[in-house]
Amino acid sequence: MGRRRSDIYEAVRRVLNYPLEDRGDYSIVYRHRVEGVGEVLREARLESVARVDKWAVHLVNGDSIPLHRIVEIRGPRGETVWRRGLGWLEDLSSRRRTAD
């Protein structure tokens, strides 16, 4: 697996594995091809992710997003927490839910 794809894979896995209060608050932004238009950016909520493997993010509706098309991960306030080529822009460890 290429370095860039493995970076994307690890970023998506990291967010999916954190015990966040509501993982639906996070989203993946990816490039989507539209016939006659070209590429447009689309967003998929993390709550719609069924699984991730080393090639793609698979959604509960059966669609797949190839890892090389993912450009960023956004947090609950719409802020970018990870961006392709830049890595982590925000420390997500402070968002971990603690056991009471």
UniProtKB/Swiss-Prot annotation:
It comes from the Archaea. InterPro entries: MJ1316, UPF0248. It holds the Pfam family MJ1316. HAMAP family: UPF0248 (MF_01245). Belongs to the UPF0248 family. This is UPF0248 protein APE_0939. It comes from Aeropyrum pernix (strain ATCC 700893 / DSM 11879 / JCM 9820 / NBRC 100138 / K1).
